[in-house]
Amino acid sequence: MSFEEIERFVSIAAGYGIRHLRLTGGEPLARKGCAELASRLMAIDGIEDIAITTNGALLPRFAHDLRAAGVSRVNISLDTLDPAKFAAVTRVGSIDDVLRGIDAALEEGFETVKVNTVAVRALDQDFFGITELGRDRPIHVRFIEYMPIGDDETIPKNIPEEGSALFKDVSAWDRSDTIPTDELRRIVSEAGERAGAGPLIACTKDRPEGHGPAQYWKFEGFKGTVGFISAMSSHFCSQCNRLRLTADGNLRPCLFSDLEYPVLPALRAHDDDAVRAAFEAALRNKPDKHKSNDGTERFMSQIGG
């Protein structure tokens, strides 16, 4: 989709009460002019704020422009602090790039800086180590249950030989690799106690700004919080108020469903009534409960997480 097409779609969506936007991917900062797009979307009547989800590697270059464009919140994906595991899972960049991106986001004064970590049993992650990013800085770490998005057992050619087995382990979803939130919270809390940070306590104040489903906890004395998103063990479909517009112009009412409503042909035909019809159909057909065990054909990078 062109920026003009995205802008026209958001203008129509704003007429239905859409107020909050998130730019995601894939990697949104790989799209030339991402900050310009954010600025154009913020200028649309009715839009109140824009957030972005990124792998963080390009944030040192673009954080200033994004903040100036009106982006208020940033989520940074970081699943591990182990360099070898990071290389095997991400296949590009380095942990240092991401950490510099986190620093850049804080320096530019984004209202909320969050780190998203997908908890995967096969990765044997240092969960408490990741939460320590928020010990002295207002970084909010959220742990997300591993979900069946996409289905690919093919090992890309650029994976180092020593990392190929690990990539294969985490590229094809296996229910046994999903760590339920109750178990994960216990793991994080007990690790905090062993490290002298004390147990996790329910977060009754200082919760980060946002409109998502995370339940927040914190370690006493930490500036940041620890959130848990229970997409698998305790779905929150009845509270879901999100629609996803894919890069190829399809409106998706549920992350876990392959049901999509094309809007790009109508946008290119300047048929706003057809766009509205697709939007209304997507709203009507948001499922009461996702069927996450079925998986999806598209990858998260194609849908927008």
Feature map (PLM): residue ranges:
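Conserved G/P- and acidic residue-centered "switch" motifs that form tight phosphate/ATP-binding loops
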Residues: 27
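Radical SAM/AdoMet-radical enzyme domain recognition
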Residues: 3-23, 31-144
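Radical SAM enzyme [4Fe-4S]-AdoMet core and its adjacent flexible, acidic
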Residues: 84-87, 92-225
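Flexible mid-to-C-terminal extensions adjoining Fe-S/redox cofactors in radical SAM and related proteins
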Residues: 232-305
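Flexible, glycine-rich phosphate/dinucleotide-binding loops
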Residues: 59, 122, 150, 235, ...
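Short loop/edge segments at beta-strand edges and connector loops
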Residues: 54, 205, 230
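Canonical Radical SAM [4Fe-4S] cluster-binding loop centered on the CxxxCxxC motif
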Residues: 1-3, 255
